Amino acid sequence: MSQIDKMAKIKKLREISDAPFVDCKKALENSDYDIDLAINWLNKNGKSKALKKSDRIAAEGLVLAKKDANSVLVFELNSETDFVAKNQNFINLQQKIGELLLANDFVNLEDALLIQDEAGRSISELMILATATIGEKITLRRVFKTKYSLEQSVEVYTHSNGQIAVITILKGGNLEIAKNISMHVAALNPQYILKVEVPNEKLQEIQLEVEKKAFAEVKNFEKKPENVRVGILKGMIDKQLSEFVLELQPLATDSAVTVEKYLAQNSATLEKVVRFEVGEGIQKQNVDFSAEVNQQIQEFQKK
């Protein structure tokens, strides 16, 4: 390899890793001028700034739901900015990680990070390499995977912007039914799947609120027969619960029926629904860009 080619490799490695010239040169010399091996060398020796970005908050990114003939999964891959989440390198990484997760068994997230690709690189290492290349912290935040049987109807839905993904597992039914439920859950994000999942305290609170409303707004409510009052209260309670309980909600694709009735009409029972949305529960970092620029200027002036 000519000296010019070596210098070009050093320049490229510096751009990727943001490591000093001397460290890039040494990394390449110890890696037979292979860029990927050199990045690994920098990471192992703590010279790459990719590892130093590990304390940053990654709250943007993409989610993806996938399935094969036996398993279904949904996972979230995070970056620091929405801009990077739209980067083709990030999208390619997400697809690769999805394939690895679907093809391999694991018991938890830590176990999943150890899964290796055909070149022997773990998912954790792939993310470190991508962090060095892209310039932002990249993390596999969470993943849900389960196996299913032929008696179950399983479908996945990932919204076109990659911000919401849902998997639905039904006993009976068919793929179209499962797909419609997945799309419904993606759009409405119900807090509970079944009415029985709602905590008793919350149910009691709603019941008291509805009873007061019934006496105040339903004409001659107190004079109606007991069975009529019970029916009115149940309808009012279910209507309020339908704001956050899946089975009581009007189906997004056909508001004439509730999800519960839609499933019953198609001989289907809801067994599992999992919905991931990018950044759920993450406290996003507030960045003062003006202060950041001023700090960089001050550091530059000290050199």
Swiss-Prot record:
Organism, as annotated: Mesomycoplasma hyopneumoniae (strain 232)
Gene encoding the protein: tsf
Domain of life: Bacteria
InterPro entries: EF-Ts_dimer_sf, Transl_elong_EFTs/EF1B, Transl_elong_EFTs/EF1B_dimer, Transl_elong_Ts_CS, UBA-like_sf
Entry-linked Pfam families: EF_TS
Official protein name in the record: Elongation factor Ts
GO cellular component entries: cytoplasm
Family: Belongs to the EF-Ts family.
Summary of the function given for this chain in its UniProt record: Associates with the EF-Tu.GDP complex and induces the exchange of GDP to GTP. It remains bound to the aminoacyl-tRNA.EF-Tu.GTP complex up to the GTP hydrolysis stage on the ribosome.
